[in-house]
């Protein structure tokens, strides 16, 4: 069922691309905005789920080691503090969305933030590392 759910976003993105191409060919510019919004939603749903699937592991659950552990300690003081802040971010998403841990390429540090719906509204310069699906179906 999870793969079918994810496939819906891929199909939605592909359909939106086809509708964009058709609207451009017909110079139907009023339809382009809706198709672009649908593309953003479905493509972000695909990307967010792709990252989320990679975050899951049957052997996971231990604290990170190496560079990630050092970056967490540097940004949050400890893994326990990071975990508490990430938990708070995930449980306070209003409506549908995601909790996210990302690398701020401008500030060179980790940040925790919320993503609403699927619009992939990551701050500019952020590389997403960890996503937690907080949609109702999750």
Curated annotation (Swiss-Prot):
The gene is sodA. Destroys superoxide anion radicals which are normally produced within the cells and which are toxic to biological systems. Belongs to the iron/manganese superoxide dismutase family. This is Superoxide dismutase [Mn]. Binds 1 Mn(2+) ion per subunit. It catalyses: 2 superoxide + 2 H(+) = H2O2 + O2. GO terms for molecular function: metal ion binding; superoxide dismutase activity. InterPro entries: Fe/Mn_Superoxide_Dismutase (IPR050265), Mn/Fe_SOD (IPR001189), Mn/Fe_SOD_C (IPR019832), Mn/Fe_SOD_N (IPR019831), Mn/Fe_SOD_N_sf (IPR036324), SOD_C_sf (IPR036314). Its EC number is 1.15.1.1. PANTHER family: SUPEROXIDE DISMUTASE 2, SUPEROXIDE DISMUTASE [MN], MITOCHONDRIAL. Keywords: Manganese, Metal-binding, Oxidoreductase.
